[in-house]
């Protein structure tokens, strides 16, 4: 009792099961906002039509048909290219399905035409040789036209945190210096 989770679209409308969106949550013990910081409140909180305060989690998810919450991605990893939302995790899943790929991350990089565009960063399996252009053709053949990866860079490894998460902010940084 007193707890709630919702999935919202970009306009703040609650989404039905099976539809992705930003996760917001509330509980009876949640603080009522930031102390004297309305700007922070605008970024981290959302109010429903009844004025009930919810915390923005920064996660993308959905409820499945059985009512279970499924976490899919982080909002900061969402790529908005030409007005289309592209989920990095969807593209990473496709890249990792290739038999010669050991690890993969997809990040947004600047694009003059689209605003942002997906870049695949791929680590080949030990002893395997990958051709970036061939892999790009292979993965894009499995994706919708608006989801396609612009290019692929091969790496020896991807930077990871102490708990094993790929440090996407570190990967994005050199591409965005001088932008935004």
Where are these regions (language model features)?
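Conserved ATP/PPi-binding loop(s) of AMP-dependent carboxylate-activating enzymes
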Residues: 1-2, 13-46, 86
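AMP-binding/adenylate-forming catalytic core of the ANL superfamily
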Residues: 5, 25-27, 32-33, 51-53, ...
């Amino acid at each position: 009792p007193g707890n709630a989770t919702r999935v919202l679209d970009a306009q703040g409308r609650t989404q039905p099961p099976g539809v992705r969106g930003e996760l917001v949550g509330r509980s009876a013990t949640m603080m009522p906002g930031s102390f004297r910081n309305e700007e922070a409140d605008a970024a981290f909180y959302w109010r429903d039509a009844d004025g009930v305060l919810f915390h923005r989690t920064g996660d993308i998810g959905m409820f499945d048909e059985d009512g279970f919450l499924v976490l899919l991605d982080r909002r900061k990893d969402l790529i908005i290219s030409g007005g289309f939302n592209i989920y990095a995790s969807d593209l990473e899943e496709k890249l990792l399905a290739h038999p010669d790929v050991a690890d993969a991350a997809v990040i947004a990089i600047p694009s003059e035409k689209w605003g942002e565009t997906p870049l695949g960063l791929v680590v080949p399996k030990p002893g395997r040789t990958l051709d970036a252009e061939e892999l790009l053709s292979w993965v894009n053949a499995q994706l919708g036209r608006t989801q396609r990866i612009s290019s692929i860079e091969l790496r020896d490894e991807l930077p990871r945190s102490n708990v094993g998460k790929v440090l996407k902010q570190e990967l994005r940084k050199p591409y965005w210096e001088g932008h935004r």
